[in-house]
């Protein structure tokens, strides 16, 4: 009995060790980074909703929530974010609170913020239209490049230079040949004048004397 007891204890310790090892092997999962919500932020949505409204007295919180919900924003989950966004926009000066206090009143865009909101809308529309038109431009540019490439091998400048060079010695030789015969012709008439001799006049025949009878 004394021998079997330590064997059982050793077996129990052996089974406990791998279990502990398995626990230590499990790596701790790294905290997954929070994904930023795609699309515009809450403050941008609020500014767009206020700028689109035509109420002169300002937009109430209820009307603002309705416009945000119509745009596809989850108002119930992000109720606190909407209130914080309104407060931050009022502090920055982009929104002006016309009625009430805090986030429960009515809000209106500041005149300076209105011009900024219009420019942002125009820039967003221009970017969207530019992104849609980009593939057409690239295709046209590629076609233009392919047409322009065969025009490059027009470089016969070397042939023009070589044709000009032989013309110069030809002009010089022609001038020398023209001058040399002129000099020879001028010398020949002088020699002919020296050789001219006057013809001799023939002697008159003497009359024969008459014979004596």
UniProtKB/Swiss-Prot annotation:
Describe tissue expression.
Answer: Restricted to thymus, testis and spleen. Present also in lymphocytic and neuronal cells. Increases in testis starting with a low level at day 5 and reaching high concentrations in 20-day old and adult animals.
Its GO biological process annotations read: nucleosome assembly; positive regulation of receptor-mediated endocytosis; spermatogenesis
Tell me which PROSITE patterns the record gives: H15
Modified positions (Phosphothreonine) in chain numbering:
201
The alphabetized UniProt keywords are:
Acetylation, Chromosome, Citrullination, DNA-binding, Hydroxylation, Nucleus, Phosphoprotein
Record-linked SMART domains: H15 (SM00526)
Q: Which residues carry this modification: N6-(beta-hydroxybutyryl)lysine?
A: 36, 54, 66, 87, 92, 108
Name any GO cellular component annotation.
Answer: euchromatin
Compositional bias of type Low complexity: which residue ranges?
A: 8-18, 120-144
Where on the chain is N-acetylserine found, per UniProt? 2
Name its cellular compartments: Nucleus; Chromosome
Matching InterPro entries: H1/H5 (IPR005819), Histone_H1/H5_H15 (IPR005818), WH-like_DNA-bd_sf (IPR036388), WH_DNA-bd_sf (IPR036390)
Q: What does this protein do?
A: Histone H1 protein binds to linker DNA between nucleosomes forming the macromolecular structure known as the chromatin fiber. Histones H1 are necessary for the condensation of nucleosome chains into higher-order structured fibers. Also acts as a regulator of individual gene transcription through chromatin remodeling, nucleosome spacing and DNA methylation.
Q: What is known of its domains?
A: The C-terminal domain is required for high-affinity binding to chromatin.
**Subunit structure of this chain's protein:** Interacts with DFFB.
Name of protein: Histone H1.1
Q: Which gene encodes it?
A: H1-1
